[in-house]
């Protein structure tokens, strides 16, 4: 740990990384506070901040020669086979670490790799290469299985802990597995933090963007007070301020042969309203809608829009255009609505629900990976990050209020490299609730723009359903309204 006065140059360097956010650190009294320029307090500067050679310091950090926490079950013949681009990442990491060791810098690296790159298998290769006892920390239980599969493939002795950390500590008194796979809430236990700081050299923080290290979280406190010897942050969408805790980044672009298409399913609805909708509309401008809760609630009861989503999905699925579908909503009740209606149409052998409240969901996810055709309905919270179903070929985004980081993570669910190259995303930029019409259009345009500009999708208009089904809910009141709607859509592309 390094307690330092907040001199101007140090403050400026740290503040620059927050990209306008408040800079918060632990002070000498152990309080997590916002750092003000010229403060007389001393602050705990994260070890990982010094990983970058651009940060000038006279501090000297421990090297791996000071510990003996080596993996005992390692077998070089079990090392996973990597693609050329993954091998390039390994080469970059090894080269950077040599330089860090020579200059006595902390061995902290952020692997900023695109969704579908294969971060898990690449990191397992690095883990086996280092030969050091490792803790893999994941934000939720859903990510455990993909790590378990890869760690077992490498042949490393491991222990998984997703429930009580107290029972894990008792087990660690008699055994010390080479690899611990834990959920991040374990880091709320100081005794556990002290144990892994002493007995494990490598710490892997998976999906590091899910943690805001400018907040006083368990992960923030662990990295500040119990900094590991080596550390990897894994993410496809780095959170800029987190760089303060891991200030060395490797980013290698992934060239892809995938054919990625995003369809904006345009339609014009007659205004739709109910007593419930009118009641929620009154709350749109109030403090209760600060995070657009009521915006999403209104979408969940927008019956014409919901029917359009179902009609589009059913037609595409029945035609065989798409086969392995992920349907994403923001709210649980919206998820349940789609699940029940699709279940009535296709049955339980095809339709599955990714419900965070059901403990069997992770096992169900494993079981559908080998299916040729399925529809998986879930929420953004549960399946937007880290969902491990590589065979997904299509995504229906039913919600609207999604930030850029969530958008990129969500689209990444259908960008995994497989033998099948076609990937399709469907968004629905219109609503029958006039009070949120333009708001939804703007949010949807952000999704489309990011997918095209950053992730290589090609945008196309989807009109097949409206043209082929005269009884569809996508009705127009007049020819003039249809023309005006097309003009509005063209202006917002």
Swiss-Prot record:
Q: What Pfam families does its record include?
A: ResIII
SUPFAM superfamilies per UniProt: P-loop containing nucleoside triphosphate hydrolases
Q: Cite the GO molecular-function annotations of the record.
A: ATP binding; DNA binding; helicase activity; hydrolase activity
Gene Ontology CC terms: virion component
Report residues binding ATP: 113-120
Q: EC number(s) per UniProt?
A: 3.6.4.-
The UniProt record lists the keyword Aminoacyl-tRNA synthetase: no
Q: Which UniProt keywords apply?
A: ATP-binding, DNA-binding, Helicase, Hydrolase, Late protein, Nucleotide-binding, Transcription, Virion
Record note on quaternary structure = Interacts with G2. Might be part of a transcription complex composed at least of G2, A18, and H5.
- Protein known as: Transcript termination protein A18
């Amino acid at each position: 740990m390094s307690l330092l006065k907040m001199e101007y140059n140090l403050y400026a360097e740290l503040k620059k990384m927050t990209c306008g956010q408040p800079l918060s650190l632990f002070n000498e009294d152990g309080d997590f506070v916002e750092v003000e320029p010229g403060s007389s307090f001393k602050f705990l500067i994260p070890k990982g901040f010094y990983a970058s050679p651009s940060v000038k310091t006279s501090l000297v950090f421990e090297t791996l020669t000071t510990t003996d926490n080596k993996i005992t079950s390692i077998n070089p013949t079990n090392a996973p086979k990597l693609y050329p681009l993954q091998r390039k990442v390994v080469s970059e990491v090894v080269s950077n670490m040599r330089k860090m060791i020579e200059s006595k810098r902390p061995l902290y690296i952020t692997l900023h790799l695109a969704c579908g790159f294969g971060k898990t298998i690449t990191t397992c290769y690095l883990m086996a290469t280092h030969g050091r006892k490792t803790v893999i920390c994941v934000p939720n239980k859903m990510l455990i299985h993909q790590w378990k599969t890869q760690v077992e493939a490498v042949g490393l002795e491991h222990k998984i802990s997703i429930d009580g950390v107290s029972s894990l500590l008792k087990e660690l008194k008699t055994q010390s597995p080479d690899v611990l796979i834990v959920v991040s809430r374990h880091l709320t236990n100081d005794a556990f933090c002290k144990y892994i700081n002493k007995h494990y050299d490598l710490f892997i923080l998976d999906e590091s963007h899910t943690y805001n290290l400018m907040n006083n979280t368990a992960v923030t406190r662990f990295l500040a007070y119990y900094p590991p010897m080596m550390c990897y942050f894994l993410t496809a969408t780095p959170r800029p301020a987190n760089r303060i805790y891991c200030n060395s980044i490797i980013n290698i672009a992934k060239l892809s042969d995938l054919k990625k298409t995003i369809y904006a399913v345009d339609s014009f609805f007659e205004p739709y309203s109910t007593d419930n909708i009118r009641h929620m509309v009154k709350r749109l401008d109030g403090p209760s809608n600060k995070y657009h809760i009521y915006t999403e609630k209104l979408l969940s009861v927008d019956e014409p829009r919901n029917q359009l989503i179902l009609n589009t999905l059913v037609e595409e699925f029945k035609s065989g255009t798409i086969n392995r579908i992920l349907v994403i909503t923001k709210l649980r009740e919206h998820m349940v609505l789609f699940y029940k209606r699709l279940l009535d149409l296709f049955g339980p052998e095809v339709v599955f629900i990714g419900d965070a409240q059901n403990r069997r969901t992770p096992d169900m996810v494993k079981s559908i990976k080998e299916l040729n055709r399925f529809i998986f309905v879930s929420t953004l919270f549960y399946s937007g990050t880290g969902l491990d179903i590589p065979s997904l070929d299509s995504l229906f985004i039913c919600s609207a209020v999604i930030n850029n980081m969530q958008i990129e993570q969500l689209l990444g669910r259908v960008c995994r490299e497989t033998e099948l190259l076609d990937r399709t995303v469907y968004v629905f930029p219109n609503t029958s609730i006039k009070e949120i019409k333009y708001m939804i259009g703007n949010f949807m345009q952000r999704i489309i723009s990011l997918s095209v500009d950053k992730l290589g999708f090609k945008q196309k208009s989807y009109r097949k359903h409206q043209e082929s089904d005269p009884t569809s809910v996508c009705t127009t009141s007049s020819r003039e309204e249809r023309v005006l709607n097309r003009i509005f859509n063209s202006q917002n592309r």
